């Protein structure tokens, strides 16, 4: 149900933030795919807490354990189960929150829906849940790299009102990871880091925008009508905690253009399968199907709901209470959300790669 | 596959724009629901072509035929099949397009994916495909009205750069439908209509933003992790033709706020199930689950790709050609997209209503 | 929901027995597949009522109408919608049944579940619902024939206690269709026809066993654990009206053998992909995956529940009533069930062919 | 994909027989359900190897570890992840099998499909995979017991040719578990145990039939057309290792009856929701929907493929080899298959309970 994603390359995650473990089952992965476990661990390291001064101080090593589906570095075609134990749990930190609803957090809605909640912390609403996504996404990335040389790059575009101006042509993973905020603009990244630290000192938080670029996308991925590639990407990214908006290609700003300005002109080509366009307002997708251009997206992340400042709120009886979060939390989720965006995009593309292969490559090739 | 949507309240659409018919099967609808066929026809009338000077002149009555699942105005609990015949087909209009890829349209990607295309017109990429969605959505609306008194209202917020300022408290369907552009701001709507007519005269097109408001949403709809309510809404709306962006609640602009500014404070309440917040930056959803506040969304629609102006493009051999669309098309899709937005939102909410009932109302009640 | 079948080669059927029409949407079919409409009509003719003295006299031409997804004899890769109008409806025939539950029929359970029923006749429980299955199955058969030269043959093995002894090596469609009971044993078929006629005269009915043989099954179809090929075949066939039992390979009788007797020995082969076995107790499937041998199944069909004899039963108030069915019904469903079995088997195999291609043929080829 | 089962009460299993662990995620379980972990462990003990002289000597404690979704004995409504470590692994036992295909086992088909296999033992085809099913089924059993007082009882009906005659009215779990073969007929069970021991001594194996009875089934579970209750039960049970046949109610033997003999007459009743029938050839299901009578099924299990006797077979190069299994295996799977049957039936019924509640209890109650 709600903890599964994908049609035939399909992940199912589990785990509460302060329970025994979090993890994922990845089913439907092709057999005999070479998988480098270090690359999985590396993505988890990019998303792990405690990685820098501007993330939550919760200190988790987040060491991945592979329980099934991989043998001597190759996939078996059977479910790949991956597990990370929760270690640095401090349920006590949230004791004062147990029956208090943090404003704009999931505490209240979980209580209204289920009438019961995980002991403490965010339960399934915690960012720890994304460990399973990131681990499975790291396998998806390797699948895409192996078959299509596809490269997924996400970075912090804006923090609060500090915006970077990135040359997408040249951007690389190395640049993105060169600083702790994951904005590949050296100068601007320093300002961003300062802003986050300042807000943290104030017991406050901020949000921003992550941009994602996918290179070497095969044309033909995606489908008409409901399972359009941009629709599945939108769902995937809007399922990440704290997201409030999604844009593909020209997004909202494209709506200020006329059709004659917005249309992406095709460039003549001897090889129709390698058709390119002069501009990319479409963001690499037309009619729900990739056209071979880069996929380009932007995702809005709201400021972290859990803040140190005192706030008025209510408890599970509806009575007014004052609260001040003691739990460890990120003053800004974006630096750690970068690998989550990568992962969700990889999961969508891997699923659509297999789906397209299933339906359209039986006859053509 | 790609033409089905929903988990247990599930629609499957079919039909090409110039084929025999378009339609939908709606499966999983509760039995004994009173359904007014006139309300279904009314929604189709709101989306039908030829309804005004600013829509495509293709003249289709779009008369709904119910083939199954309803008896004397009540649902049977079995699949509801609904059909609309294509009548005013002029495949000849698109003869010059058959092997020509309209820029930023689905022609090229369909060809790359399938290697074969519907005779003419947009095939499944045509807005005619949405007839099935709108018909099924009209049933979903009645289900939501019957069980929760839920009301879904969408309207044109902006056309090109002409923006309206709407008082959401007072807005009504009557106001929205009081003018042909479906912007409930009388003065601004006149400007919008003028702009669309002007661009039409120029053989050009424009886009804009539709806003959607849902009142009386029961709390508890939606689920953690992947099937968050906002994620399913994002997918539903980004699956509509011509969409480029989606926002829930504060959207992209909310990312300029600090956490202390963005958080929606709860108001104390004796009845916890009727909890409200002082602001609604969350847009009615927290942690993927509705909190009982209004759901508020914005959707970006790009300018129509098919324009009358001459454009350079390529044909299926990759050779450069000049084209000038003769087919009938909308200079701006937004007025007709309003009922499509309503429909997709209704389908998502109806499905989540049943899903929540399945999992969470067995014990509670 | 319950009216859809298949994961990526997916059918959704609709229609009540005495409503406007019955039909099907087939989604996920590969594009550019050559489809002969006559072969679809031919399968419908094999299942249509009124085809002989031993079937229901309801006279329906069951002429197929293709609404979408096929252009000039080739699939577009988009949903194929197919429709058959109900013509020879006589709702009056069932007037005396409207609130009476036929013993062992779906009348009672539909009433208990939905609290409302189709006007008359069996609604979705009628054999007319299978029209959509047979039409879609005829497309699946052509897909399987085109890609793998796969041939599906079903026939009547036993009627009541009259059993045939068939040489499976030589059996052909022509033989099967050479008589109206569809038993390819000329002598025994005459006895079967006599038995059915005799029971019909008595206002009674009978059941029996259909056998199914699939030749040229590619190895590798099916999956471990839940979606084993035999499990999906069992579900497909047990979803046909009136089925009470399913066997693959040695079935129940194989349980009387010892392992050393039951095991199918492999025959050495230079080409491992063409591995064969000396016996076929496995029925062509091992561990849920096809091994390249013929798939062999048997399906038990109970005697028709609707009979002309007077029976004691109850009405919707639970009161005892006497009933004697006036509606037109089959004294034995098996002759018309043969094409239904073919269709369901074809749908399962086509779906698994695409699924296997998706997961396992990306790397191998 | 293939390792998931259920629509909204959904399990996903993972794990190879000789990997790190096997387990399951159960998603969609209602919140606030009281779950007794001992009852889960108890079901695992019923299926664990090494429990008696007539099962495999592999000695696994199979101690369940709950990783998420349960807090202080109550479900949270979030995914319940359960894990069992593999301890008594002896991959060496199967060394001589690594590239040898055991006749009638999954070795050959896994190799043909995936081109790669788990290190040794059966991988996903091993009975160890069913641990996840049994653990999740034990939760489903508690759900059914809590809401409907439903009781699922399975037992060994026949071993090889030794058949028991059971009085279904009186049968109890205590009787079933009173002997190691799980046949509640004391005298016959002794013969069965002797037969199994004798065949084990000969290095041979046997199969048989398990019968399943479900009491207190609410009417209205199941759906028309494809997701008929008996169809989902057939799939569930035919997905268990070694199954070759499935019967509901009268099964194959019912096909020897006339309609007038086979029909189950309704008994008049003041309360229509408690309608009963004089006989139960339907096996508790009519038209795909439960009628409130007991559900009755029979499942055929073939003799274990892995035997100690020397057999001729082939290796992965297609060359002929002689083999004699050294690995520990069951001479007869039925005693341990009893809790597997219980589990699969529970999973199907729990899913259909929620599905029926979702669609049909919104209006009625």
UniProtKB/Swiss-Prot annotation, chains A, B, C, D:
NCBIfam families listed in its UniProt record: aroC, PRK05382.1
Comment on bound cofactor: Reduced FMN (FMNH(2)).
Record field: catalytic activity: 5-O-(1-carboxyvinyl)-3-phosphoshikimate = chorismate + phosphate
Enzyme class: lyase
Pathway involvement of the protein, from the record: Metabolic intermediate biosynthesis; chorismate biosynthesis; chorismate from D-erythrose 4-phosphate and phosphoenolpyruvate: step 7/7
Gene designation: aroC
Assembly: Homotetramer.
Record protein name field: Chorismate synthase
Molecular function GO labels: chorismate synthase activity; FMN binding
SUPFAM superfamilies: Chorismate synthase, AroC
Entry keywords, A to Z: Amino-acid biosynthesis, Aromatic amino acid biosynthesis, FAD, Flavoprotein, FMN, Lyase, NADP
Protein residues bound to NADP(+): 47
HAMAP family: Chorismate_synth
Pfam families tied to this protein: Chorismate_synt (PF01264)
Binding residues for FMN: 124-126, 287, 302-306, 328
